[in-house]
């Protein structure tokens, strides 16, 4: 279960049980001319959307987490996320391996043994990043998730609107989109 929480709160907190939902209406593109070095550093998970029943069931208990993106030895990214779980801060690291074009990665869930694609759809590097993850836990169990990352704990209203519009364009509904509340724990440098 810790793996589930880590993946959800970190980037693509992937590998949770999925409910089928309408397929995305548009193909997801990757940030043109993605500059991985500018993407490094601290981010806060500000919003999530997913077709997984887990998000709908647990969204009231979720809160913002801090993630630090660092280069990995293989050219990919290490995503280290610190989040609140059972009133304690937990830290997990996941390896995003490069997958084709710049800004495209893959992540293999050690818990489920499934591989997910993770794309940096849009970022200005200084304020926000929109990420989209997709994969399959098994036959007929498609998983999709969008994540809004912010360099600050208080993303601007326009960024939330941009994220909501992006999510709806991917077929997510209002009940599958959540903006994560700040917490006074686990968000500062440790």
Curated annotation (Swiss-Prot):
PROSITE patterns: LIPOCALIN (PS00213)
Annotated EC: 5.3.99.2
UniProt keyword list: Cytoplasm, Disulfide bond, Endoplasmic reticulum, Fatty acid biosynthesis, Fatty acid metabolism, Glycoprotein, Golgi apparatus, Isomerase, Lipid biosynthesis, Lipid metabolism, Mast cell degranulation, Membrane, Nucleus, Prostaglandin biosynthesis, Prostaglandin metabolism, Secreted, Signal, Transport
GO terms under biological process: mast cell degranulation; prostaglandin biosynthetic process
Disulfide bridges in this chain: 89-186
Compartments where located: Rough endoplasmic reticulum; Nucleus membrane; Golgi apparatus; Cytoplasm, Perinuclear region
Top-rank taxon: Eukaryota
GO cellular component: extracellular region; extracellular space; Golgi apparatus; nuclear membrane; perinuclear region of cytoplasm; rough endoplasmic reticulum
Keyword Signal belongs to the record: yes
Active-site positions on this chain: 65 (nucleophile)
Annotated CDD domains: lipocalin_L-PGDS (cd19419)
Reactions it catalyzes: prostaglandin H2 = prostaglandin D2
Signal peptide: 1-22
Physiological role: Catalyzes the conversion of PGH2 to PGD2, a prostaglandin involved in smooth muscle contraction/relaxation and a potent inhibitor of platelet aggregation. Involved in a variety of CNS functions, such as sedation, NREM sleep and PGE2-induced allodynia, and may have an anti-apoptotic role in oligodendrocytes. Binds small non-substrate lipophilic molecules, including biliverdin, bilirubin, retinal, retinoic acid and thyroid hormone, and may act as a scavenger for harmful hydrophobic molecules and as a secretory retinoid and thyroid hormone transporter.
Quaternary assembly: Monomer.
Domain remark in the UniProt entry: Forms a beta-barrel structure that accommodates hydrophobic ligands in its interior.
Family, per entry: Belongs to the calycin superfamily. Lipocalin family.
Full protein name: Prostaglandin-H2 D-isomerase
Gene name for this UniProt entry: PTGDS
